[in-house]
Amino acid sequence: MAHSNQDPHCPEHRLYGNSSRKIHVDGTLWPLRVGMREITLSRPYLSGGQEFTSFPIYDTSGPYSDPSVTFDPEKGIPPVRDGWGFIARESDRAAATAPEGSMTTRIPRKAKEGSGITQMHFAKKGVITPEMEYVAIRENQRLEEWTLSHGRGAVHATPVTPEFVRSEIARGRAIIPANINHPELEPMIIGRNFRVKINANIGNSALSSSIAEEVEKSVWACRWGADTVMDLSTGKNIHTTREWILRNSPVPIGTVPIYQALEKVGGIAEALTWELYRDTLIEQALQGVDYFTIHAGILRRHLPPAEKRLTGIVSRGGSIMAKWCKANGKENFLYEHFEEICEILETYDIAVSLGDALRPGSISDANDEAQFGELKVLGELTTAAWQHDVQVMIEGPGHVPFHMIEENMQKQLEYCHEAPFYTLGPLVTDIAAGYDHVNSSIGGTLIAFHGCSMLCYVTPKEHLGLPDRDDVREGVVVHRIAAHAADIAKGSPAAWLHDELMSQARYAFAWEDQFNLSLDPEKARKLHTESLKAAGHTGADPDFCTMCGPDFCSMKKSKEAKTLH
């Protein structure tokens, strides 16, 4: 079917890199082609004894920035992982035919009987999978030579190797969320010894949004730098919405399965059952969901202290399970059946994101008995999941004052055995409505510096409504800044070089290079053009400073002073 902007199921998908080109780096262990974008610079810049006429950047946009790839959003993007042959060799068919409602004819896969299929399983056996080599190449950004020679600002000036990736996964300090039924995925890694990652939340609700809008938002989030996307749909057509998102997503997709389970019982939390939830897990596993948020750590003993809070339980999944426990007078069935949950996860290599059902919803509730009590249970569940070779990350707060953030990271490392931490912010104040994306990025920078592996974005609509396309862009870019700032502080050579090239371009008045090296080139270019017009300047003089005018530019005068004797 031809693409049509009039067709509500065909949102505009094609995205191109801004003044950059798509490049691919070949694997040496596996037949991989790892996509990156390369920015062409207007002049050579020197750093660490090397000359740079271009700069390769980490690219989360998949085929959407590759003009050589053609695709139909109703059929999905190319299944790149199928070409590596590893999954087909190591797994069996999970069904005779494609599931009902599938957009493709691909038969879902599962682990072979009595054998493992997870990245942790292979890592413990000493096997480097295609996904491990892929993420090592991505993390290096084709800057291995410069990394080895780099000293200033870098703490760990050593290129990432596939073996290092394998060892981190084997130890549980990093995960590659990559369901064997998501062949469109371009693998990425989440761990504190790697680039800090960003997650974007999307999803319809009973109040608004269509399938097409959510697919477009997921692609849009990838365009601006989201490393993973969570589909938090709670409205109609949850299964179909998820299928469209998965088949068109080059990044890992996460879900909160309890949302769909709740929809199946008409929104009545106390009517939920383990059997219904189990079937929902399997349904989503066969579709290809890469990680599940599961609120298995909230127990009945945590409810009394939670009820004393200023803002109670603010996690949707947490409030659902709290109501179920109280209404039925029983322990959380997600906790009671966690071993069975892990058996499902290990069958398809789905990572578990252990949900923080008791995250604080206000700074008054931060670091309280309920929050840290649940965190200890999440540590117990982590070791249980590792017994099944299931990859684990831990979800964290939430609303936490700036001076109390480091304690969260320290306790998470202690209680949860160094499993990756994934936080919503933290938001450092409660009064930033309309600007909570900035609020979140402040706390996010600090906790990422202390070791948090992935930041969940917050948009300007946080606490106010569902984000639209512009909100998604704003939220992703602001949190990309936070993650990048933490990467610099942690000693990332690639992050340091990116900033150094920008500073050289700024000093040289190389405006196009400044735009292209920024995280939002379109906005930077637009604001500069508006400033030129406001100053009545044509732009013919490249040294004209739109900040200071012709007579007060410090960089211009600094360069002039250099010529004086």
Swiss-Prot record:
Task: List keywords of the entry alphabetically.
Answer: 4Fe-4S, Iron, Iron-sulfur, Lyase, Metal-binding, S-adenosyl-L-methionine, Thiamine biosynthesis, Zinc
InterPro entries xrefs: ThiC, ThiC-associated_dom, ThiC/Bza_core_dom, ThiC/BzaA/B
| Annotated signal peptide | none
Function summary: Catalyzes the synthesis of the hydroxymethylpyrimidine phosphate (HMP-P) moiety of thiamine from aminoimidazole ribotide (AIR) in a radical S-adenosyl-L-methionine (SAM)-dependent reaction.
The enzyme's E.C. designation = 4.1.99.17
Instruction: Write out the similarity annotation.
Output: Belongs to the ThiC family.
Cofactor binding note from Swiss-Prot or TrEMBL = Binds 1 [4Fe-4S] cluster per subunit. The cluster is coordinated with 3 cysteines and an exchangeable S-adenosyl-L-methionine.
- This protein's pathway: Cofactor biosynthesis; thiamine diphosphate biosynthesis
Q: Please list the GO terms describing molecular function.
A: 4 iron, 4 sulfur cluster binding; carbon-carbon lyase activity; zinc ion binding
- The membrane spanning regions, by residue number, are none
For this protein, the record's PANTHER family field holds: PHOSPHOMETHYLPYRIMIDINE SYNTHASE, CHLOROPLASTIC, THIAMINE BIOSYNTHESIS PROTEIN THIC
Kindly list the GO CC terms recorded for this protein. cytosol
State the species of origin. Chlorobium luteolum (strain DSM 273 / BCRC 81028 / 2530)
**Annotated binding of substrate, by residue:** 201, 230, 259, 295, 315-317, 356-359, 395, 422
Whichever gene encodes this chain, its name is thiC
**Cofactors (names):** [4Fe-4S] cluster
EC main class here is lyase
Enumerate the catalysed reactions: 5-amino-1-(5-phospho-beta-D-ribosyl)imidazole + S-adenosyl-L-methionine = 4-amino-2-methyl-5-(phosphooxymethyl)pyrimidine + CO + 5'-deoxyadenosine + formate + L-methionine + 3 H(+)
Protein name per its UniProtKB record: Phosphomethylpyrimidine synthase
One of its GO biological process terms is: thiamine biosynthetic process
